[in-house]
Design a protein with these regions (language model features):
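Aromatic- and charge-enriched surface segment that lines or borders ligand/interaction sites
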Residues: 94-136, 156, 284
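A structural "hinge/loop" feature
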Residues: 52-68, 91, 117, 166-174, ...
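Detector for C-terminal structural segments
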Residues: 26-30, 289-316, 347-354, 380-479
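Surface-exposed binding/hinge segments that line
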Residues: 96, 100, 139-180, 190
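Ligand-site clamp/hinge motif
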Residues: 208-252
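Ligand/substrate-recognition segments at binding pockets and active sites
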Residues: 329-394
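N-terminal lobe/hinge region of extracytoplasmic solute-binding protein
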Residues: 49-99, 129, 186
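Gly/Pro-rich hinge or "lid" segments in bacterial periplasmic/extracellular proteins
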Residues: 4, 162-214, 218, 226-229, ...
């Protein structure tokens, strides 16, 4: 009864407390440290609840991190990163550059798709060519000119120009190798897709996977947008793992006894940027954007997090100068009424209220427009808003991949991406890492000067694991 009372207090506080709101890749699943260690007799089915819906399971068509999270369980990539961040072969047995424009690959033997057909060179060719023609990020494959099959296990990828970033690109989950037959898609990973609908994704262990002792038998992914509801599911033992937990919600969970020392709390590896983006309903000049930037409270001192790119030229000043801000507002003729579109979550509501409060002190009224997931996603995709709070996921695969993902997929701003072509070409041609970092920083400086969005903060969410998995978790930690 006492624990139940704590839960009610927690949910009430999370939703209505003035402190919270005055009126949000399963890293460990990548590393297998829970999945492979869970004993079958204890956890035949592992239940995971994340913050948003899985929209697609075709790697080439995925745009969001919530869908991307499940990819390592179903598919494999040609290359991956080791613990030190170096690019290493994955589905590839051997590789070498024949020259600056030809990459030789020899595939591993004994790798099977979920339809029980063995992986062959033609499957790699078909996958990469599909991405180039139909993929969400097809622009990053424009330099790939041809793929020559030598035999079932060997092939050569040819390029129009030198591309020293291509191996990094092939580590990305969206470049996973798949087999497409009619409307079906098969991977080579630990789990195959048992069912997928609007409510859940159910995965089943693939018997022919090279490591056949993977447990549990099934993994069920479902989704719930509100942190509080995911906590309830964990509390009621309806899930063993909840993802995408906001730091503030985590603190309140601890404060009210919903989370205890028995829970495992893991900070996600993947970074996100909370940003203020600009839609098509009104034309905001660069001067207007700079005026807004000078007003709102921000933590991001760089356009990308330092973990993605060390900033020198692209540092951002987050200090507040009221006199300067007032001058920028007057000079830019910034409107006195702004409509702010948000996703109807505790995190977005809290951030929106903070923006509204500070803007009001400068005589600017902010109308907050909350939307459910479907409506919000449609607004963002179509640019049908004035300004919006938007969470931009940042992926492994280097700055080139992130730039392509943000401007070709997340924000669909092809003009900015095309304007960077000379610098991106130079980045692909540069071999020395130090020189590439200088080019990367300069690219970010150029992007930021165009103000495509205002980065408010860079952050990581958290994953919370049930105490039932505690022993399994710590056994992995010892390894």
């Amino acid at each position: 009864m006492k624990k139940f009372l704590f839960l009610l207090i927690f949910i009430f506080s999370l939703s209505f407390s003035e402190e919270i709101s005055q009126n949000n890749d399963l890293d460990f699943l990548d590393e297998n440290y829970l999945v492979e260690e869970v004993q079958k007799d204890n956890f035949e089915t592992l239940s995971i609840i994340q913050g948003k819906k899985i929209e697609a399971v075709d790697p080439a068509q995925i745009k969001d991190n919530y869908s991307k999270r499940v990819l390592p369980l179903i598919y494999q990539t040609l290359f991956s990163f080791d613990d030190e961040g170096k690019t290493v072969p994955n589905l590839v047995e051997k590789y070498r550059w024949l020259n600056g424009r030809e990459l030789y690959l020899q595939l591993k033997n004994g790798v099977y798709f979920h339809n029980n057909e063995e992986l062959k060179a033609v499957d790699v060719k078909n996958s990469l060519e599909y991405i180039k023609e139909n993929g969400t990020l097809r622009e990053i494959f424009t330099e790939m000119s041809d793929i020559k099959i030598l035999n079932d296990a060997e092939l050569v990828i040819k390029f129009e120009e030198e591309d020293n970033t291509f191996l990094e690109i092939l580590t990305s989950r969206i470049t996973a190798i798949v087999k497409r037959e009619d409307e079906k898609i098969y991977g080579t990973g630990k789990y195959l897709i048992k069912s997928f609908d609007n409510n859940s994704l159910v995965l089943e262990k693939f018997k022919k996977y090279e490591e056949n002792d993977v447990y549990p038998e099934n993994i069920v992914f479902s989704w719930e947008i509100q942190d509080s509801q995911r906590f309830i599911s964990l509390f009621n033992e309806e899930a063993q793992i909840i993802c995408d937990v906001d730091k503030r919600a985590l603190e309140y969970g601890k404060k009210y006894g919903i989370l205890t020392e028995e829970n495992i709390i893991k900070e996600d590896r993947d970074l996100k940027t909370l940003a203020l983006t600009f839609g098509n309903q009104r034309n905001y000049t660069r001067e207007m954007k700079k005026a807004i930037e000078s007003i709102i409270p921000r933590e991001a001192t760089s356009f990308f997090p330092k973990e993605v790119c060390e900033s020198s030229f692209s540092k951002i000043d987050v200090s507040i100068d009221e006199k300067k801000s007032t001058e920028l507002i007057e000079k830019s003729n910034l409107r006195k009424h702004i409509k702010l579109t948000i996703l109807n979550t505790e995190k977005h509501s809290r951030e929106a209220e903070e923006i509204k409060k500070v803007m009001k002190s400068y005589g600017i009224e902010v109308e907050i427009l909350p939307h459910n997931v479907e409506s919000y996603n449609q607004k963002i995709e179509e640019g049908d808003y004035e300004i919006a709070l938007f969470t931009i996921p940042l992926a492994k695969g280097g700055i080139l991949f992130n730039i392509a993902k943000i401007f070709m997929s997340d924000l669909e701003n092809i003009e900015i991406y095309n304007s960077l072509s000379p610098f991106l070409k130079k980045l692909k041609e540069e071999c020395e890492r130090e020189n590439r970092e200088i080019i990367e920083d300069k690219i970010l400086q150029l992007i930021y000067s165009e103000m495509p969005y205002i980065p408010i903060s860079h952050f990581r969410d958290y994953t919370v694991v049930s105490p039932d998995l505690r022993e399994i978790f710590y056994e992995w930690e010892k390894k």
